[in-house]
Amino acid sequence: MTKDRIDRRFAALKAENRAGFVTYVMAGDPDAATTLSVLKGLPAAGADLIELGFPFSDPMAEGPTIQRAAQRGLKSGMTLQGTLDLVAAFREGDQDTPIILMGYLNPVLNKGFETFAALAAKAGVDGLIIVDCPPEEADPLSDALEAEGIALIRLAAPTTDDARLPMVVRRTSGFVYYVSVAGVTGVKSADAADVAPAVERLRKASGLPVAVGFGIRTPDQAAAVAKVADAAVVGSALVDEIESAAQLNENVTEKVLLKASELAKAVRSARVGTK
């Protein structure tokens, strides 16, 4: 299974002429049981693919929202192994929705690439995004993941020039993740007019679907990106819901799934009437 789930999902989306809706949540925020409850509810709320962050003490690419989520995850005792356990528990009831782990190199390095890849495949992980692993240094990780059929998904940014792009997309599989705004997650907003040519350029360079994230917070922004990209990724807006619901002692799962559902509807309707 593994990476095939990603390929099948994007093929199905293409057949339906719509972009995918990709959700991001942090494992262990605010606790493991809530994360599992949210994961189980996301597909019915409209998530086509799920990104699951594993907490790290120095998440340098993240804005304040995800940094706080990482701190809450660590405080709840979440680890990389605990994150894999959540995926395995999710897989007991869902064999179709792709799950991509997203995080930083250090915890993966500490496990050992081959050990991590084998455990991730066994748990039912389909892809991995490592924010701080440049392509020049990624071959050992790529080798381990490819041996288990797990996609290594690369990040490309507005600053990725033509000289750099071939290195970025080399050995990328599943999809390319376009960081639509320079800087950290969840702070600035994506501009759909800038996104369209960037998506086209990345599709040509990689031959893969392109998901766009970092800066999509509202249904309107999600719909604008979904018109031109193969998928729209929303993270900070969902994590904000988790944080505020937990602070107010509200039902976290209910609140985050409601927000996900609003965003999913916007993504699904973005191309209605187009061919």
From Swiss-Prot:
Reactions performed catalytically: (1S,2R)-1-C-(indol-3-yl)glycerol 3-phosphate + L-serine = D-glyceraldehyde 3-phosphate + L-tryptophan + H2O
Pathway connected to this protein: Amino-acid biosynthesis; L-tryptophan biosynthesis; L-tryptophan from chorismate: step 5/5
Keyword DNA damage on entry: no
Active site: E51, E62
GO MF term set: tryptophan synthase activity
Gene3D superfamilies in the record: Aldolase class I (3.20.20.70)
Cellular component, GO annotation: cytosol
Enzyme Commission (EC) number: 4.2.1.20
InterPro entries: Aldolase_TIM, RibuloseP-bd_barrel, Trp_synthase_alpha_AS, Trp_synthase_suA
Pfam families hit by this protein: Trp_syntA
Domain of life: Bacteria
Alphabetized UniProt keyword annotations: Amino-acid biosynthesis, Aromatic amino acid biosynthesis, Lyase, Tryptophan biosynthesis
HAMAP family linked: Trp_synth_alpha
Family recorded in the similarity comment: Belongs to the TrpA family.
Protein task: The alpha subunit is responsible for the aldol cleavage of indoleglycerol phosphate to indole and glyceraldehyde 3-phosphate.
Quaternary data: Tetramer of two alpha and two beta chains.
Protein name per Swiss-Prot or TrEMBL: Tryptophan synthase alpha chain
Organism from which the protein derives: Caulobacter vibrioides (strain NA1000 / CB15N) (Caulobacter crescentus)
Recorded name of the encoding gene: trpA
